[in-house]
A protein has these predicted regions:
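Basic phosphate/pyrophosphate-binding loop/patch that engages nucleotide-derived ligands
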Residues: 161-169, 226, 245
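ATP-grasp fold ATP-binding core
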Residues: 162-163, 190-211, 232-243
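ATP-binding N-terminal substructure of ATP-dependent carboxylate-amine bond-forming enzymes
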Residues: 2-147, 151-157, 164, 175-188, ...
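Glycine-rich phosphate-binding loop of ATP-grasp-fold ATP-dependent ligases
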Residues: 31, 170-174, 197-223, 245-247, ...
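Phosphate-binding site of ATP-dependent enzymes
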Residues: 212-305, 326, 331-333
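Hydrophobic beta-strand scaffold residues
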Residues: 49, 140-141, 169, 198, ...
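ATP-dependent carboxylate activation and anion-phosphoryl transfer catalytic cores
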Residues: 2-3, 8-16, 20-24, 44, ...
Length: 379
């Protein structure tokens, strides 16, 4: 309930959710898929919803529920936000914010917001920017706050924080825009100190976009150029040979420690075993999500404990998917932490919770309840 809204006190009313999706990042289409899944799962006895899409050019537009519900992959084609739809705006009020649709010189359908669920992946959505906007507008929102969102979006900053908190991770090199443009040979020399294969990634990207697996130094410049199409800052990670890619879902709690799911394993049936964009999102790909992962009990507990430690250390709230590598001897290291993981009904994060009895609709409800319960402002 919005603070100060006297007309609603004591009434059994539905909370008003602002669903935001799309965005100006390269993960726009994945965000649309996520929005469709969440909208279909929303408990309509608990929540009313207003849908706002952010077109690739940055326009905020009002999208009707029927259109969002229809978002799906059709013949390998992904949905996008239609920039020609009517503009949508947020209006700051004494008790929070309203959302409205622009109709000529008028604002129509003006609706107060109790909580926002920004289903945005990557820059301008998962990186603290929209979280800062919601803070300024006095709107509660699902997920991590400004600082932890920004840190976790930047793979280099995140790994630096892992080191500060004695959380194990693999070797890596950061290549900034200034370093690459001024002395690429020095950058290649630093990368050469890591063992091949290398994974060259946009430092602030996601959904495996712009990532290249490289086995020889001659291919590094092209891989860096590819990553720089998505982000001027690049991270090069030493490949983890012989390890299994295991993921764990973490869910915040109103009381006590965050909750960790049983871990799941990504089993890619290709020679490179690289979990790229196609294997993540397109149908009929050579990949299995094994839930729960076939691991000894002590290793499972090690993964879960490390996931919760990372969640707490980086100040994350609401949800995160923590990606790890598990070696044959049982050693576990962190790969990364995602504050807004893929969230369709078939994505790893919801599937991990479903495997332990938390269905998709219940998971969405828990996240909204967590956001509604937390105070506004710094915390």
């Amino acid at each position: 309930m919005v603070e100060g809204d006297e007309t609603r006190k004591g009434q059994n009313v539905r909370s008003r959710v602002l669903l935001v999706f799309g965005g100006a990042s390269s993960e726009h289409e994945i965000s649309c898929l996520t929005a469709g899944g969440v909208l279909r799962a929303l408990d309509r006895e608990r929540f009313d919803v207003t849908c706002v899409g952010i077109a690739k050019g940055g326009r905020w537009v009002a999208v009707d529920e029927e259109m969002v519900t229809s978002y799906a992959i059709v013949d390998a084609s992904l949905p996008t936000v239609d920039a020609s739809l009517p503009d949508a705006v947020l209006i700051r009020t004494a008790s929070g914010a309203d959302v409205a649709r622009v109709d000529g010189d008028s604002l129509v359908g003006r609706t107060p917001i109790d909580v926002a669920f920004a289903l945005l992946h990557g820059p301008f959505g998962e990186d603290g920017t929209i979280q800062g906007l919601f803070e300024m507008m006095g709107v509660r929102y699902v997920g991590a706050g400004v600082l932890s969102s920004a840190v976790c979006q930047d793979k280099g900053a995140m790994k630096q924080q892992f080191a500060v908190h004695d959380l194990p991770t693999g070797p890596y090199v950061i290549v900034t825009d200034a370093q690459w443009t001024s002395d690429p040979d020095a950058c290649l020399s630093r990368i050469g100190e890591l063992e091949a294969p290398w994974f060259v990634k946009p430092a602030r990207g996601g959904s495996s976009m712009g990532i290249t697996r490289v086995t020889t130094t001659v291919d590094l410049p092209a891989a860096i150029a590819q990553a720089r199409c998505f982000d001027p800052q690049v991270i090069v990670e030493q490949g983890v040979v012989g390890a299994r890619e295991v993921e764990c879902a973490v869910l915040g709690s109103l009381v006590g420690a965050p909750l960790a799911s049983l871990p799941g394993e990504i089993d890619v049936h290709t020679e490179s075993r690289f979990y790229d964009f196609a294997t993540k999102y397109l149908p009929d790909q050579p990949v299995d999500l094994v839930i729960p992962a076939d691991l000894p009990d002590d290793v499972i507990e090690r993964v879960r404990e490390l996931a919760v430690r990372a969640f707490v250390a980086l100040g994350v709230e609401g949800l995160a998917r923590v990606d790890t590598f598990v070696f044959p001897d049982g050693t576990v290291i962190l790969n990364e932490l995602n504050t807004m993981p893929g969230f369709t009904a078939t994505s790893m994060y919801p599937k991990l919770w479903d495997a332990v009895g938390v269905a998709y609709t219940e998971l969405v409800t828990r996240l909204l309840d967590l956001a509604l319960a937390r105070p506004l402002g710094p915390r």
